Design a protein with these regions (language model features):
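Mixed-charge, Lys/Arg-enriched low-complexity segments
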Residues: 77-111
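Generic marker of "main functional regions" within proteins
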Residues: 4, 16-20, 68, 74-77, ...
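Acidic, low-complexity, intrinsically disordered interaction modules
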Residues: 33-85
Length: 111
């Protein structure tokens, strides 16, 4: 599937089958020279007994998408791709965290 085919199918609200979802998650597109496809960030949930949830945020031609996979953690567990891509907004945010602590110091006693 090309990048433009993916975007067109997404915009037309077509459902992707599991094979398509795997290719999309792996960013396995046929790209033209002007296509821009990047992974922005990835996050893994805590491993469960047999699998872990993997979320990937990507930029595809200036649009941002969340992609998901349930990755098998053993050679007997397949990775499953069941969740459809979801377009998201993206912005970098700088946050400042204020920490309040208690301080104690000794008082000198008068003699």
């Amino acid at each position: 599937m090309t990048v433009k085919e993916f975007l067109n199918r997404y915009d037309n609200e077509e459902r992707f089958d599991e094979q398509d979802l795997e290719a999309i998650f792996d960013l396995d597109f046929y790209e033209d020279e002007d296509d821009k496809v990047y992974i922005i960030e990835e996050e893994y949930d805590e491993p469960r007994r047999w699998s872990r949830f993997h979320t990937r945020w990507v930029e595809i031609n200036g649009r941002y998408f969340e992609l998901n996979a349930d990755e098998g953690l053993t050679e007997y567990q397949d990775t499953e791709y069941m969740i459809q891509p979801q377009e998201v907004t993206y912005k970098q945010v700088t946050r400042t965290i204020t920490v309040t602590e208690n301080e104690y110091s000794y008082i000198e006693r008068k003699k």
